[in-house]
Amino acid sequence: MTPLLTARGVCRSYGRHAALAPTDLEVRAGEVVALVGPNGAGKSTLVSILAGALAPDDGLVELGVARPRVGWVPQQPAQYGRLTPRENLELFARLERVAEPEAAAERLLRLVDLPDDGRLGAELSLGNQQRLNLAIALLADPDVLLLDEPTSSLDPRQRRRFWELGGEVRDRGGAVVFVTQNLEELERFASRVVVMLDGGVVFDGSIAEYERSPEADVFA
């Protein structure tokens, strides 16, 4: 099966610090890939490069033959603080050339259960900002959903809803790649685990293989 998304030798340094060593990664339809490892391991750098938000120093990211759509939920708020959630969604819908931006915004507000009470993006709680990030990422019905610690500020109910929406992307033939420090999320949702350490991949295998490996101690 042709991968939806492929990274070949991507790397990134900041001055003399190598944040990401040359790294290869293939993401296939139906996969839910967890990126785990200690802080500074290169997880967020890799996801940002996969999303096209950060240029690698070398290497490349290739999309599959069908040119899959990619949605990205960064760790930090990625919306306009002076706009309401509805205004943010309508703006991003127009940028993504989504048909009927107003209707799309209404649908996504309901989908992520985000209050439409007139508050600006900068006035939202961290949890609601994360839900708005997800709504923006889902606007174009992505085939690949990239998530950087997306549920860290969500309560248990919101977290379950978040993963229901991620599961819908997978179930329609897409894939999810997520950075997490949450062992429960890893065990419940991941089909594949990639462990990173010091800017490189030290393990890549199924969740069952991961649970039998020494790299499972990353959560110890």
Region spans (language model):
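Conserved ABC ATPase "signature" region
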Residues: 90, 102-117
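Catalytic Walker B motif of ABC-type/P-loop ATPase nucleotide-binding domains
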Residues: 145-148
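Conserved H-loop
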Residues: 174-179
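The feature captures the beta-strand-to-loop junction immediately N-terminal to the Walker
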Residues: 36-38
